[in-house]
């Protein structure tokens, strides 16, 4: 399946003190969309932005806003992110985990820390479908995401998902290394799913080809993009 390769620079790695300038760099680079990571300090061990910042980015950017909700109970905030100007809204399957939910691997009662992420062996498919359908009812694209250690447990919701996002690092912080174990899951999903497959975490010009070859067609790049002197060239190298 030949799908156009899209690049989505992540604002998580941007300098928020000059955010408008950073957005202009994305626009001028030839990238396809802007990726915004929303974190609540509970689902992941970091706090980032909310609807107010998404709305501010919307006012500055004439690009697709790809909003990734790494939060608990995302259904409570869908309308807020719709109203803020999101074009794509992605929720985590682990936010609606069923039996087999592992909230904090190797926790040892110390709280969710960097290098950990919530995992799920199965999900409440009905609940996930409801939220995906709600997102689409507003005319937005709906995505579902999986953390690196979660198995491919979303087959039952694919018909309602415009996009599947694989986290290839443990979510919460930028600058991490790509987790190779995600590649087989991308390959397995592509065999049964014709929609968009997005990958986020540790992506650069050295591993982009293997990710694309596995079946992904949207690459999120944070540290690699904002660390590049020539950002247009960085985007071209990711596309291959």
Indicate where each model-derived feature is located.
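Alpha-helix-loop-beta-strand connector modules within alpha/beta enzyme cores
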Residues: 47-68, 131-145, 180-201, 237-240
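C-terminal helical cap(s) of enzyme catalytic domains, especially alpha/beta-barrels
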Residues: 102-111, 212, 224-240
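Catalytic cores of alpha/beta
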Residues: 22-23, 73-84, 149-161, 203-219
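Hydrophobic faces of well-ordered beta-strands that scaffold small-molecule active sites
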Residues: 5-10, 34-36, 57, 65-69, ...
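Conserved, mostly hydrophobic/aromatic
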Residues: 19, 26, 37, 81, ...
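Glycine-rich phosphate-binding active-site loops on the catalytic face of alpha/beta enzymes
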Residues: 89-98, 165-174, 214-234
């Amino acid at each position: 399946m030949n799908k156009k390769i899209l690049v989505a620079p992540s604002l998580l790695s941007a300098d928020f003190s000059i955010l408008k300038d950073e957005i202009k760099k994305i626009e001028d680079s030839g990238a396809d969309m802007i990726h915004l990571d929303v974190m609540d300090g509970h689902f992941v061990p970091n706090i980032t932005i909310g609807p107010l910042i998404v709305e501010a980015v919307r006012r500055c950017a004439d690009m697709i806003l790809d909003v990734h909700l790494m939060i608990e109970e995302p259904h409570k905030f869908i309308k807020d992110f719709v109203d803020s100007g999101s074009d794509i809204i992605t929720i985590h399957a682990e936010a609606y985990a069923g039996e087999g939910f592992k909230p904090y691997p190797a926790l040892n009662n110390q709280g969710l820390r960097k290098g950990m992420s919530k995992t799920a062996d199965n999900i409440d498919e009905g609940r996930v479908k409801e939220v995906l359908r709600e997102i689409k009812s507003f005319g937005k694209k709906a995505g579902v995401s999986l953390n690196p250690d979660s198995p491919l447990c979303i087959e039952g919701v694919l018909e309602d998902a415009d996009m599947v996002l694989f986290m290839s690092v443990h979510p919460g912080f930028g600058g991490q290394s790509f987790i190779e174990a995600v590649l087989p899951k991308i390959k397995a999903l592509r065999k049964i799913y014709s929609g968009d497959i997005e990958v986020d975490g540790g992506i650069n010009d050295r591993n982009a080809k293997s990710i694309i070859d596995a079946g992904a067609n949207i690459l999120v790049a944070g540290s690699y993009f904002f660390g590049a002197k020539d950002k247009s060239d960085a985007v071209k190298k990711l596309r291959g």
